[in-house]
Structure formats: C-alpha cells, structure tokens
C-alpha cells in the first residue's frame, strides 16, 4: 500500500509540473477577476458535485480572506441556496439552475466562473451562453481539453488531466493562486 500511495503522490506532482506551464493563463484569470472587482462588479461561481464545493470554497476565500486581512470582496457561489436550486430544478429543469439565478443577479461587467471537470456540464454551458448575451464575462475551469465550455467561455483554463480527482486538485490550486494574486493586486501584500 505504501508504494501505491507514493506513486499517487508522484503522479499528483507530475500534474502540478504540467500545470506550471499554464502560469500565463492563471495570471490572465487573476487579471480578469481583479478588473471585475475593481470596477465594482461581482464574481459568481458555479459547478456541480465536487465542483460545487470548490465554487463555494473559492467564493469564501474572496468574501472572507485568503491570506490578507482585508475588506470582503464581492463574490458568491450559485450553488448554495437549496430552495432556489430545487425550485428552479423542479419547475424549469436542472439544466437551468445557474442560468435562472444569473438572470436575476447578474449585471453587465460581472464575472461568471464555471468549474467542470469535463467541461460539458449543460447547466454551466447554458449559464455561460446567457452570461455572454447579458454582458457578463465568463471564465471556465475545466479538464479533459475544455469540452463545450471552452467554446462558450471568454477564457478557459483546461488543466492537464483526464482524471476527475486530479482535475479538482488543480482547480483548487488555480483558484488559490488567483485569490492570492487578486488580494495582492487590490490590497497589496
């Protein structure tokens, strides 16, 4: 079992070495997030399953703090209100749970960040299509080459893996780097 654990950890390290080649893309996402917040707009996150949890995690880093003690930043996860999710899912279909919320709270200049390991989550694709029509910017965090989200998002980081768990690990690493860069750019440090 120790050998298996060692090999898994080395595989994770290899994934992160490959992710390092995407530093410029990560910097671009941080710039988009920083510009959004500096303009007085908000960042909205969405995802399904583990990516829903990651969406909440990243919104919390911005509203709470990542490393710096500073004022709250305007961010939210569209994955947290069970009454909205179940009402919209029941009445309109699960594929609309994010786009319906975006229609209500999104404003031109806001940013929608969609997380999906496959890049093909229909509810996120539909939300991104609506976002573009509304003047809401879009960033996709995916794996597996980007999927359909790569085609509809303004900017896509497709992390270099096809394994769901490894994609999610890299999404959190990318998200943490973005949070740190945004904090530093807006509040110094």
From Swiss-Prot:
Catalytic activity: 2 D-sedoheptulose 7-phosphate = D-glycero-alpha-D-manno-heptose 7-phosphate + D-glycero-beta-D-manno-heptose 7-phosphate
Molecular-function annotations in GO: carbohydrate derivative binding; D-sedoheptulose 7-phosphate isomerase activity; zinc ion binding
Ranges where the SIS domain occurs: 33-189
EC number(s) given by UniProt: 5.3.1.28
Entry's Gene Ontology BP terms: carbohydrate metabolic process; D-glycero-D-manno-heptose 7-phosphate biosynthetic process
Signal peptide: none
PROSITE patterns per UniProt: SIS (PS51464)
Cofactor note: Binds 1 zinc ion per subunit.
Binding-site positions, Zn(2+): 57, 61, 168, 176
Subcellular location: Cytoplasm
Binding-site list for substrate: 48-50, 61, 90-91, 116-118, 121, 168
Note: The reaction produces a racemic mixture of D-glycero-alpha-D-manno-heptose 7-phosphate and D-glycero-beta-D-manno-heptose 7-phosphate.
Matches recorded under NCBIfam families: gmhA (TIGR00441)
Known function: Catalyzes the isomerization of sedoheptulose 7-phosphate in D-glycero-D-manno-heptose 7-phosphate.
PANTHER family: DNAA INITIATOR-ASSOCIATING PROTEIN DIAA, SEDOHEPTULOSE 7-PHOSPHATE ISOMERASE / DNAA INITIATOR-ASSOCIATING FACTOR FOR REPLICATION INITIATION
Stated family: Belongs to the SIS family. GmhA subfamily.
Name recorded for this polypeptide: Phosphoheptose isomerase
Species this chain originates from: Akkermansia muciniphila (strain ATCC BAA-835 / DSM 22959 / JCM 33894 / BCRC 81048 / CCUG 64013 / CIP 107961 / Muc)
